[in-house]
């Protein structure tokens, strides 16, 4: 199903014309209404007159998370505060939060994008959405809620946590669509199994999962345990939260709503554009945002873009699954390691639960990496030989994929702390 066929299936030439018109308007707005961007453009020797098509976007300055924090809280807003009707913020690990302001038009556009996503998942007005993303400053809960209401669905505003009640209402209310992080979906699946309630009494059919990286192996695990079709929903709070991109029924990549958020892929070191299909850092420019439009925002997400028409009929660009983040990449003894690589190995082996912890340290001037991973109950044994054989199998597979050795410690089921939000998978104790 397609929510807005006129946009989602528009020919590329017509789409580029729309993007060019919207980019020029956005640049004019930020140049006149946002001192930060006016100064940035003046330093580069450009004015809005230099931006006449979407191809001219490469002339514009980049924006980073540090720019948002340096202009905290409302320094990048392009409208008076009287027009800002909602404020969201992401809680970074350190320092002040990243603040984003929305006008009524911004919220409407965001809801439109989420409606496209949920429709692509096969959801509609007859569905009951259980929104288990956090409500509040985090964009997930309120964003998914508005998108579900926009397609006419019923919404249970559960928010995150309180797992026992989540299961009760999911069972009693007949929830058909679950919105949460993929790690919490797995946690819910285990909790449902332990509750003793028969899975066939649940009516879940679709999951919209995002807010953290996940793998195809994790998707299969979720689908098997919950008996649903699991879809990726992409977003980031600086741009619009969930709904920036979405999968269709083909699941051959994530369609980006590029009539609102124009994507580029650049080399993270040189910041030069890369060819279509090549991996690099994802960059977004707002084309319709009123409250706080951003130019060439560096997401730090590593991926690639594909512009050929999807077999679903959509022409919107497709993005590969996020490989990782350029700022999350671990360099271990000169080797680039992404946590998603390790997760893929764990999830392809039936002996292990999808719960792990990666501990990185530096001892005697040498990087060390210890992986703690839970063994499934049916494979866990008190027999040392069996555990050693299982450990050896995992070590060999990791060596093959990563190209370096990993110290592995097999732990008992349910011994690694669970999270109802984004899972904390990596602890890097090195003094870099």
Describe the role of every protein-language-model region.
Residues 1-89, 94-112, 116-120, 365-373, ...:
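Nucleotide 5′-phosphate-binding alpha/beta core
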Residues 104-117, 128-187:
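AMP-binding/adenylate-forming
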Residues 128, 195-214:
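Conserved helix-loop-beta element of the AMP-binding
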Residues 178, 288-402, 421:
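AMP-binding/adenylate-forming catalytic core of the ANL superfamily
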Residues 184-203, 220-224:
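Adenylate-forming
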Residues 205, 214-309:
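Conserved AMP-binding/adenylate-forming
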């Amino acid at each position: 199903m397609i929510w807005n066929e006129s946009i989602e299936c528009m020919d590329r030439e017509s789409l580029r014309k729309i993007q060019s018109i919207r980019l020029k308007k956005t640049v004019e707005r930020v140049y006149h209404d946002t001192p930060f961007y006016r100064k940035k453009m003046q330093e580069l020797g450009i004015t809005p007159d230099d931006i006449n098509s979407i191809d001219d976007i490469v002339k514009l300055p980049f924006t980073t998370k540090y720019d948002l924090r340096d202009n905290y809280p409302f320094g990048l807003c392009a409208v008076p505060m009287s027009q800002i009707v909602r404020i969201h913020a992401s809680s970074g690990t350190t320092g002040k939060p990243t603040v984003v302001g929305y006008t009524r038009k911004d919220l409407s556009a965001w809801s439109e994008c989420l409606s496209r996503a949920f429709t692509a998942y096969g959801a509609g007005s007859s569905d009951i959405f259980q929104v288990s993303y956090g409500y509040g400053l985090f964009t997930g809960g309120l964003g998914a809620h508005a998108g579900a209401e926009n397609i006419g669905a019923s919404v249970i505003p559960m928010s995150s946590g309180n797992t026992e009640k989540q299961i009760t209402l999911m069972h009693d209310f007949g929830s058909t669509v679950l919105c949460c992080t993929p790690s919490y979906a797995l946690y819910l699946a285990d909790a449902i199994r332990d509750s003793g309630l028969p899975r066939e009494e649940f009516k879940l059919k679709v999951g919209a999962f995002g807010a953290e990286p996940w793998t195809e192996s994790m998707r299969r695990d979720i689908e098997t345990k919950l008996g649903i079709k699991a879809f990726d929903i992409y977003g980031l709070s600086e741009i619009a939260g969930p709904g920036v991109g979405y999968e269709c029924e083909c699941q051959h990549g994530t369609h980006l709503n590029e009539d609102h958020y124009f994507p580029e892929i650049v080399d993270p070191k040189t910041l030069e554009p890369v060819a279509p299909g090549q991996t690099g850092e994802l960059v977004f420019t707002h084309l319709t945002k009123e409250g706080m439009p951003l130019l060439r925002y560096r997401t730090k997400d590593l991926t690639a873009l594909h512009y050929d028409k999807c077999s679903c009929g959509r022409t919107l660009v497709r993005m590969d699954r996020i490989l990782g983040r350029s700022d999350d990449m671990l360099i271990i003894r000169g080797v680039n390691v992404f946590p998603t690589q390790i997760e893929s190995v764990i999830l392809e082996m039936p002996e292990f639960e999808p719960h792990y912890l990666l501990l990185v340290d530096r001892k005697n001037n040498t990087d060390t990496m210890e992986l703690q991973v839970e063994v499934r109950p049916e494979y866990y044994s008190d027999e040392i030989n069996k555990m050693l054989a299982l450990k050896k199998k995992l070590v060999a597979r990791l060596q093959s994929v990563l190209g370096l050795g990993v110290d592995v410690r097999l732990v008992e089921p349910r011994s690694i702390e669970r999270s109802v939000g984004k899972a904390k998978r990596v602890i890097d104790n090195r003094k870099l």
